[in-house]
């Protein structure tokens, strides 16, 4: 037992439950169809050594695909990519939900080896506590929860690390709990505000009217009798370096900042805007970087995930406070974060995903939501999950939680992406989205590097022109306009002009991409 481990465990009865990861392996092969819950969100705060030990056992004993070693795996969002990828490669994941990242798990899903379902993240953790996902179990519970912590309180409760996610709900639903105490990571104590699940009809309103407001506990409460093992982990989270913002992302950010300036001038937003939500990726980083350099002051953030760019945002003096459920930082970002702990910790709070993504709070605060889709169609239906309607990427995540309930709902995307044979082979503005996650009723603004389509109050026919003229790539504008004109001509005959489509051509750009490597058509 290391001195750091002993120091971090302030509940002394747990000292008798210290085990190695290898000593926990037998719990996982006890019976088929086990339900397993992990901590973690967007690749940080997930368990590492126990899942790795289970993988090693499966590999050494040629147990890949054995029914006792295939699991229903639930994580608040994506877990550590390396760990989950190893499970996927060993055919250990029978069912997965609600969000994942990594080529092996995506391959398992799209090849039919793993059943996957996604869900709005605020609803997923809630539905877990309703027993919706364990209906075939007599106990209606999770068999094992493996939760990363950075400290344990005097009463045996958990201090999470850089992610809260669905850990409170997973702990609540678990029969057995394994705590991975990460001594490589400094303690995050004081950075959390945790609310445990309360089921209807006893649920009360979330008394949050400001991003910095607390209403929970600084730890995850649990029943110490459920804890079967404490395992030391000495491995830091691994997050890849962020790609620098390209010119397209910077142009999108500039278009958004111009919109905010216009909304302030028109009196529809206050001078310090309203709480901001931003996803992850190059465009999201460019937006945050642009806001850090812009003239807006005293900004607040209510979001899911904070990336390295938010550290610059804090240091610019323009950001007052941020709430999230995960801090997804690179190695350099975490070092910078802990080197400036006294400053950053005063301006940051980590909550569960049920709270960070809660529609009640998002609507009350008037959040400005910004997310990136796979594609958006001319009537502003957005696809966030399934390429060509069939191939799952990662899952819905929290985009729907925010976009349905925000005061200002924004989707930003490049106007076009390269295919294998054409540098502009994929238009992100299409006649009809091949899968719809966000409907036309959810979006206010669509932004590309070409411009910004303000869709508020527009009819579908008006939206189609706005989308094509403002957001589509020039290589596709005439083609898309020709589709709209053809659709309006045909639908006029049948008196169905509200949202005109030519069904035989609605997906022709997608089929042409599959057959010819580009969405650019010779003719409709």
Curated annotation (Swiss-Prot):
It catalyses: acetyl-CoA + H2O = acetate + CoA + H(+). Keywords: Cytoplasm, Hydrolase. CoA binds at residues 279-283, 398. Gene3D superfamilies: 4-hydroxybutyrate coenzyme like domains, Acetyl-CoA hydrolase/transferase C-terminal domain, Glutaconate Coenzyme A-transferase. GO terms for cellular component: mitochondrion. One of its GO terms (molecular function) is acetyl-CoA hydrolase activity. One of its GO terms (biological process) is acetate metabolic process. The active site is at residue 304. Its main location: cytoplasm. InterPro entries: AcetylCoA_hyd_C, AcetylCoA_hyd_C_sf, ActCoA_hydro, ActCoA_hydro_N, NagB/RpiA_transferase-like. It is found in: Cytoplasm. Its EC number is 3.1.2.1. Belongs to the acetyl-CoA hydrolase/transferase family. Presumably involved in regulating the intracellular acetyl-CoA pool for fatty acid and cholesterol synthesis and fatty acid oxidation. This is Acetyl-CoA hydrolase. It comes from Yarrowia lipolytica (strain CLIB 122 / E 150) (Yeast).
